[in-house]
């Protein structure tokens, strides 16, 4: 019997989840919930139905796991605890500093209703977090490094678009090659924010806008650009569409450590991702964890979980015997 999936929110992430379900034979998309008028939302799965978010509660016995595809700033802090009262839920909450409080609010709602809520699923947080944990457990004497890119940062692109005089923009985060090599060589460097990444902005300005002012506003923006070496390119709308319409991303999680009685041996653990589509990859991780949420809840588990709490075997459609035979 298929695991019945619902999607809440049908943007880049929601569409990615729909595509990922197509590649997982044990999952079935039943419903997409939207804040828009349902008749205006066209989905790809002919056997699924689009509903208003207001109708979600009526579907609580027809959906095994709801994958919540909202934004971390304002949507998920409200939506995940709210829907954990009705469903097993998965989200991709990625505001690292606020994960503990988000966990607590989802945990209270999910425990009360007897559901599972797996939060902060994706690649960072998510797959990168897991690799940091494994590497820390194995190389206890060492240092962690995370590099992001080269890729489009959605949050930084949005921040540039909000600047006066900007019509559209894309921002790329780029690892500094020399810093990456020093880490890979086991040199254990102490790196500042500026030494690890650069930022590159491609900006379409409004007609007659003050380009020097826009460039200054970008480069001095606190929390986003002021701590980085930032390059700004002004280009046409056509160039932006032609050359920068994709959403690629990726990065590296590296731990460099020492073993031996006198710390005489060096080791480097590296995990890397190179993604054509950031939302489609994130969606694929969400779908694997939806399977895990269903299985864990069937066993009687409830409450909030993170990727740290989910045993790897729960993620895979194959059973234990098959995994031991083919993957171990």
Feature map (PLM): residue ranges:
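C-terminal substrate-binding/catalytic lobe of Rossmann-fold NAD(P)-dependent oxidoreductases
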Residues: 4, 15-16, 23-54, 152-290
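Glycine-rich Rossmann-fold phosphate-binding loop(s) that bind the pyrophosphate
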Residues: 10-11
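Rossmann-fold NAD(P) dinucleotide-binding segment
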Residues: 56-65, 73-92
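General beta-strand structural signal in soluble alpha/beta enzymes
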Residues: 91-92, 117-121, 147, 170-171
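Rossmann-fold NAD(P)-binding glycine/threonine-rich loop
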Residues: 93-117
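Oxidoreductase and adenylate-handling cofactor-binding alpha/beta cores
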Residues: 127-143, 158-168, 292
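NAD(P)-dependent Rossmann-like dehydrogenase/reductase catalytic/cofactor-binding core
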Residues: 267-328
């Amino acid at each position: 019997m298929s695991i019945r999936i619902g999607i809440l929110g049908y943007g880049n992430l929601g569409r990615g989840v729909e595509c990922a379900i197509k590649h997982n034979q044990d999952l079935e998309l039943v419903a997409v919930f939207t804040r828009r008028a349902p008749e205006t939302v066209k989905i790809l799965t002919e056997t699924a139905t689009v509903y208003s978010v207001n109708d979600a509660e009526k579907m609580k016995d027809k959906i095994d796991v709801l994958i919540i595809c909202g934004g971390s700033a304002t949507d998920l802090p409200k939506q995940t605890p709210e829907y954990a009262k009705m469903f097993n839920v998965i989200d991709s909450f990625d505001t690292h500093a606020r994960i503990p409080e988000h966990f607590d609010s989802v945990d209270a709602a999910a425990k009360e209703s007897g559901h599972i809520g797996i939060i902060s699923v994706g690649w960072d947080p998510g797959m990168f977090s897991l690799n940091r944990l494994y590497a820390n457990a194995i190389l206890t004497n060492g240092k962690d490094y995370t590099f992001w890119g080269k890729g489009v940062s959605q949050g930084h692109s949005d921040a540039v678009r909000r600047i006066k005089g900007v019509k559209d923009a894309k921002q790329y985060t780029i690892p500094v090659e020399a810093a990456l090599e020093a880490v890979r060589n086991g040199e254990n460097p102490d790196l500042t924010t500026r030494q690890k990444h650069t930022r590159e902005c491609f900006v379409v300005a409004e007609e007659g806008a003050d380009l020097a002012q826009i460039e200054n506003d970008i480069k001095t923006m606190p929390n986003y650009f002021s701590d980085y070496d930032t390059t700004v390119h002004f280009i046409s709308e056509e160039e932006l569409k032609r050359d920068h319409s994709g959403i690629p991303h990726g990065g590296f999680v590296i731990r460099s450590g020492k073993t031996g009685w006198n710390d005489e041996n060096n080791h480097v653990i590296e995990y890397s991702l190179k993604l054509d589509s950031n939302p489609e990859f994130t969606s694929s991780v969400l779908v694997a964890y939806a399977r895990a949420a269903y299985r864990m809840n069937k066993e009687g588990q409830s409450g909030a979980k993170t990727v740290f709490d989910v045993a790897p075997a729960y993620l895979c459609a194959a059973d234990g015997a098959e995994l031991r035979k083919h993957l171990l």
